[in-house]
Amino acid sequence: MKFKYGTVVLGSFLGLSVVLAACGARGKFDQFDDGKIKLASSLTSKAAANALQTIIEKYNIVKSGKDYPIEITQIAGGYDGGRTDLQTRVSVKDKTNFYNLILNYPDLVSVLARSGMELLFDKVNVDKLEPNFLKFNEQISGVAKSGNYGIPVSLSTDILVLNGPVLHYILNSAKKEEANSQVKSQIKTSQIQAKGSLTIDTDENTKSLWEKIQNSAKANGETNQKGRKAAKSNKTALVQLKNGADTTTNEENKDTKTSDDKVKQTWGDYVEKDDGLKNYTFRASVFENWHDFLDFSTRVAKSFTEKVSNITNKKGTDIQGVLGVDSSPNVLFASVFAAGGGNYENFFYKLKDGRADFSNFKNKGSSYQNLQSVFKD
């Protein structure tokens, strides 16, 4: 009977990677060689599962004749289900039905390492991978020696989405009228609200962002005679504010008042306050770091007391806040990692003598200090 190596884990701190299993020592075992590579997947998204299936089918077509075909083994329960299934099969030394690859997070390598089932990718060419994407391997504890035990397959991405029309109403309500500016030449004088004292910086990034914010409000205000959105292919209310293309057309026929008036119905009136947007200078860089972003969001909330900061008797359809977060853990992890300079040694744990060291959580530890800094923000 032929045997083949055990398990590969696909998963990383940012996404998915690959881990192999070895044989010969205490706890290790070989699998029966069934002439195929089993890839365990616990993906819960149908679209992602279908995409994976398409990739595997393509690989099986183009692979060389001497290479084994890949077969997907579906595991229920998401990543946690995959972890439980792997732990069970390793503990009972399942030689027949155990898989060779698994899509999961890289800490599963440590689970395999307890039984000596981890294996280095020492013969895999990773030249086409960004080295930073492989750094998670340096944070895996309990392995026999350092190296690449996992290879990233996909990455998780956090994005920031700005509501252009709403942001325009907020800034336009708070800013002071400028005597001679490009902004004034593009907007009707009657539309410029001279209530506040906010200024918009004149650096190139801010000027570009402000122009796109204006364009999104103009597009949002365009309606047909029936009061519905104009359905022209070259017009959209959603403009890629930071990096999108310029969508300005027929500027003389566009204005922002319609959009601002509609947004005002939901957000209420602007109130000039010392701890709000009074004398505030708006810059595009406010969206590039956590501290300034939270400060700006807080100031906006305090500047719209009627609809935002007043939490008494709020309904589900009312404005719940300025900043919405889809995943609180991801925001916490990303902000703490950034506060530590993007250095794993300053993150939640670090490796010491091959083992996880959580001393960073002590009062004077870097992780504790960074968590405290983020919390105070």
Curated annotation (Swiss-Prot):
Keyword tRNA processing: no
Residues with lipidation of kind N-palmitoyl cysteine: C23
Region listing for Disordered, in residue ranges: 217-260
InterPro entries, sorted: Mycoplasma_lipoprotein_cen_dom
Lipid anchor positions (S-diacylglycerol cysteine): C23
Basic and acidic residues composition-biased segments: 251-260
Main location: membrane
Compartments, record wording: Cell membrane
Superkingdom in the source lineage: Bacteria
Family: Belongs to the MG185/MG260 family.
Official protein name in the record: Uncharacterized lipoprotein MPN_281
Species this chain originates from: Mycoplasma pneumoniae (strain ATCC 29342 / M129 / Subtype 1)
Species classification: Bacteria, Bacillati, Mycoplasmatota, Mycoplasmoidales, Mycoplasmoidaceae
